[in-house]
Amino acid sequence: MSYNFTDPYEIARFIKEVKKSTPVKVYLKGNLEGVELGSIECYGNNDFYVLFGESDEVATFLTENKDKIVSFRLENDRRNSAIPMLELLNINARIEPGAIIRDRVSIGDNAVIMMGAVINIGAEIGESTMVDMNAVIGARGKLGKRVHLGAGAVVAGVLEPPSKTPCIIEDDVLIGANAVILEGVKIGKGSVVAAGSVVVEDVPAGVVVAGTPAKIIKSVDEKTKDKTEILDDLRK
């Protein structure tokens, strides 16, 4: 079944219909020789094993084979999860430990995703864009090329309440730390959003906005460009 991940109602339908998952990992001491594992993955030999599987199946397995088990320790990090984490191995970007990136996210070449960043389903991150520490990009948020999203900043998602219009951050925009871009807002190319601002309406290209709610305070000039320089070396 296919889904349109640019539509909030389609994303919601996907979350409703997809099979939910509660994966677990088990460190087990015992003798599992000849034991039927079903769909459980098992690695090890002699008297030590590591098992991977769904919670219900693993629980049944442990109960049915308790006479063969000396001890075990179970780890679990989610419950009835609908959307897995994005597979990162083939992405040409720098993604630091601790970033949380859901599946169905697009990340452009040479982007940088820092520790603690959270990126939800359907988001798009452009080439050479940096998402700094603890920044949040909600469902379907779109960041262009060479954007800097400051630490703790939020680009609101448009999944609930549903909206046809996502947040759009155009190329070469700098968003300061802890700024908030509300649902459906568009930030024009080359603009700067001051730290701590709350942006409630569209921002044209080439301006600086600040405050709560954010207002235009000036046009981007050479002094502004010097203070908001993007460093290519961080994106190599």
Swiss-Prot record:
| EC top class named in words | transferase
What protein does this entry describe? 2,3,4,5-tetrahydropyridine-2,6-dicarboxylate N-acetyltransferase
Reaction equations catalysed: (S)-2,3,4,5-tetrahydrodipicolinate + acetyl-CoA + H2O = L-2-acetamido-6-oxoheptanedioate + CoA
Q: What HAMAP family does this protein map onto? A: DapH
Pathway(s) this gene product operates in, as recorded in its UniProt entry = Amino-acid biosynthesis; L-lysine biosynthesis via DAP pathway; LL-2,6-diaminopimelate from (S)-tetrahydrodipicolinate (acetylase route): step 1/3
Q: Which UniProt keywords apply?
A: Acyltransferase, Amino-acid biosynthesis, Diaminopimelate biosynthesis, Lysine biosynthesis, Repeat, Transferase
Q: Please cite one Gene Ontology biological process associated with this protein.
A: lysine biosynthetic process via diaminopimelate
Q: Name one Pfam family in it.
A: DapH_N
| Similarity annotation | Belongs to the transferase hexapeptide repeat family. DapH subfamily.
Q: What is its EC number?
A: 2.3.1.89
**InterPro entries, sorted:** DapH, DapH_N, Hexapep, Hexapep_transf_CS, Trans_hexapeptide_repeat, Trimer_LpxA-like_sf
Keyword Methyltransferase listed? The answer is: no
Q: Keyword Amino-acid biosynthesis on this protein?
A: yes
What this chain does, per the record? Catalyzes the transfer of an acetyl group from acetyl-CoA to tetrahydrodipicolinate.
The record's GO molecular-function terms, alphabetically, read: tetrahydrodipicolinate N-acetyltransferase activity
Q: Which gene encodes it?
A: dapH
